[in-house]
Amino acid sequence: MAQSKPVKKIVLAYSGGLDTSVILTWLKETYGCEVIAFTADVGQKEELSGLEEKGIKTGASKVYIQDLRLEFARDFIFPAIQGNALYEMRYLLGTSLARPLIAKAMVEVAEKEGADAFAHGATGKGNDQVRFELGVKSLAPEKTIIAPWRIWNFGGRSDLIEYAKSKGIPVSITVEKPYSMDRNLMHISYEGGILEDPYREPDEKMFLLTTSPEKAPDAPEYLELDFQEGNCVAINGKKLNPYEVMEALNTIAGKHGVGRVDIVENRLVGIKSRGVYETPGGTVLFLAHRDLESITIDRDTQHHKDKLSIEFAELIYNGHWFSSRMKAVRAFITETQRYVTGAVKVKLYKGTCSIVGRKSSVSLYNPKMATFEKEELYNQKDAEGFINIYGLPAQETARLRKK
């Protein structure tokens, strides 16, 4: 059953594929209202030409296709890198970062068009339904949200195909891939189908962004990444905007097989899910940025930030991009990045990204203090008093418990 609350105009997150094409027609049929299709270009590399015509033929009153690649890199990927966001210590959150941006853009279209409802094609078992809907609830709490997969009676792909045929929906019926794929500027994710067996190795033909490490170039490639306040602004001296940085690093690091991850992660809804990810550019940025922090942020601030990065990643993964807690966490992260300026030299070789050098005009690393040679600034005799005070709790605990 559909929601009882009447709606007048719906903005649908639309890809032009089987699911959202069926949803478009089903929404019009079920709610008897105008449906506006919205497509975001977040670097998925899909053919977007002809999508507007397809949406209109399927029944959309209007089709919006927005290029959000620069905004995605600048306002979502780069802040995640600044915060060292890594979910469960392994996942760089590519899909999680794109969803709040799409929700934000859909809200803007809804306000422009006077729409009072949103619809999406996320299933009731995944994380994306939460991310989309929390985004809308945070930005447009008065709007209605429609999630067809939680409402209708279609059981799966075969039911959708039959419905599409019966309604004359213009979709190309192809052999279903043995897994699902989601691509954007940050990564490509693969899950489901044959990948549901966590012991089965992925087929090498599956990977689109990265060369097999075994077949990667036999010579390493070195890059110098320039950072300003935690953001990469140049590669090998060439100034680039955030979108260009991601495009360049995806190509270069992908050629060397960098950024493959095969994990089982804990979904927000409580299900464990196997995911295989290609994140070449994001991997290089993550490692280089964290390394630069090691010479530009003091110890106590860095340690606290490292702890907060776990919470930051969970907030992103769980769809809380626009929450008050996220704003507070990001404010702290932004403050820590004031001096994260400098250059990092990385070495790419057969699936690995190694940091081989770093420098900064505001570095806290003092070779005169760190030297193993005759010191000028550090008096080793001072260490004895420090250790006596620092070790006092341990010493007293041991002494008193021996009584």
From Swiss-Prot:
Annotated binding of L-aspartate, by residue: T123, N127, D128
E.C. designation(s): 6.3.4.5
Positions of L-citrulline binding: Y91, S96, N127, R131, S180, S189, E265, Y277
Pathway it works in: Amino-acid biosynthesis; L-arginine biosynthesis; L-arginine from L-ornithine and carbamoyl phosphate: step 2/3
Predominant localisation class: cytoplasm
Highest taxon listed in the record's lineage: Bacteria
GO molecular function: argininosuccinate synthase activity; ATP binding
BP-aspect Gene Ontology terms: argininosuccinate metabolic process; L-arginine biosynthetic process; urea cycle
Cross-referenced InterPro entries: Arginosuc_syn_C (IPR048268), Arginosuc_syn_N (IPR048267), Arginosuc_synth (IPR001518), Arginosuc_synth_CS (IPR018223), Arginosuc_synth_type_1_subfam (IPR023434), AS_cat/multimer_dom_body (IPR024074), Rossmann-like_a/b/a_fold (IPR014729)
Subcellular location: Cytoplasm
CDD domains in UniProt: ASS
UniProt subunit comment: Homotetramer.
Official protein name in the record: Argininosuccinate synthase
Protein species of origin: Leptospira borgpetersenii serovar Hardjo-bovis (strain JB197)
UniProt gene name: argG
